[in-house]
């Protein structure tokens, strides 16, 4: 079986803190998640990988055995790794690569609650299917925000139960090329390629082929303005100069079928079964997408968003939620509709391709109505009416309230842009290539190692607050930038604000005094911060250094990280953890 069924993703776990063991066996086999066969990665013989279910406070021991024909490692995305930085899963920073035939054990404590995921952190193996969900159930006495949705005690009890038994929903894009083939295509053509074949929901999807003119009508106005033709039959933007910049390109080397040449195929959709007797259902959405920004909705079912990146927020009502790469949102849904089949839709935001994936939410028991459900969004992610409410991602107040320090101890501006071609990206003018780290002694052994003297990095002291401003650079070589979902390993940080133009100030304080409208009244607390694609813009964050070790800060678009868009946070160098080589060496 090549997929993980929706029912299995809700597997039960022990109800009290314990030591919980999981084994993940990685194999390279032929699969067809969207009806087209290709080689891919399976975890324990399935795709996506099995769910890791824990209770808050549990000790997780996860044994990974690599039967793949290449090196790998596993990162537990969003897990803070407090006091276990050697378990972060980044080759060259926290461990040596797990070579073919080797095994490696990750051990960490589930200090937090919420929705996370695990995935490959070597090369472009996410694009080959190495990922699976993680859910940590909150301790029974943890304060939850459900009373802000309903003050009915029965409703609150039902919502707490729904959270514990939530439906884990992995949203991803899928390509007929392997990850390494995709990266090779960019290197040989010089193009920044972003076309996918399918959108998958829990490992199932189809290839849909529509009329290019019909798809072009769904293109958002900013992208429509730069089109000099229609979209391709796969719904992808053609390779146009405003997107690709003033670099050398080789269109004759684009692999057939990559950007155009659509051939339909189908598989059975994932089905999520809900029971109206439970009153409420919770869906834990996880974006495992490599290239796509996915907007998710459930027909005729408003959603109360109550958790973002593994942290409660004051619940927000929304009909659709946009997920950038690596983000997680948990929602509560009232089960008060007639028994029927309701579409779950995951549509690309439309910036680089018009494409969607689908699943079905069905009510258990009773006669099922055959009428089609009414959507909130269309195939191109556009709202179907003026009444549709998208989630406002700038208004996500943490629950309970939490705020950053009023002043930082350190301040950095990073200049985001291209380096040597359309497809090579950087966080600050130089390429940070993960592939170059594989042969080096991992940085966790010593922050002063000469191998990392010239690496792109930020060095901090423990118990300090750090401000980082991400400045998008616009030039002839980069006339337009896509949104960059910048994921911070280790602990979360605060999104302070965003603005247009250049960040011409020497501090956040100075910027707030000059442009108060650019800053959020309540900073958003999360582990992924997405830049605005609207020309020359900046995004400001603040985080607390409280977990010494080497951690990545990087764009979570797989192709962007692999081409150089990352840097090292050498956090807490004054109290660096003592680590021995055998702790981080696979066997």
From Swiss-Prot:
Protein EC: 1.10.3.-
Binding-site residues for Cu cation 3, renumbered to this chain: 121
Amino acids binding Cu cation 2: 77, 119
Binding site for Cu cation 1: 75
Membership in a protein family: Belongs to the multicopper oxidase family.
Name of the molecule in the record: Laccase abr2
Annotated knockout phenotype: Changes the gray-green conidial pigment to a brown color and reduces the ornamentation of conidia. Reduces overall laccase activity only during sporulation, but not during vegetative growth. Causes enhanced insect mortality compared to the parent strain in a wax moth Galleria mellonella infection model, probably through exacerbated immune response of the wax moth.
Entry's induction text: Expression is up-regulated upon hyphal competency and drastically increased during conidiation. Expression is controlled by brlA, the master regulator of conidiophore development, and is responsive to the copper level in the medium.
UniProt-listed CDD domains: CuRO_1_Abr2_like, CuRO_2_Abr2_like, CuRO_3_Abr2_like
Native source organism of the sequence: Aspergillus fumigatus (strain ATCC MYA-4609 / CBS 101355 / FGSC A1100 / Af293)
Subcellular locations according to the entry: Cell surface
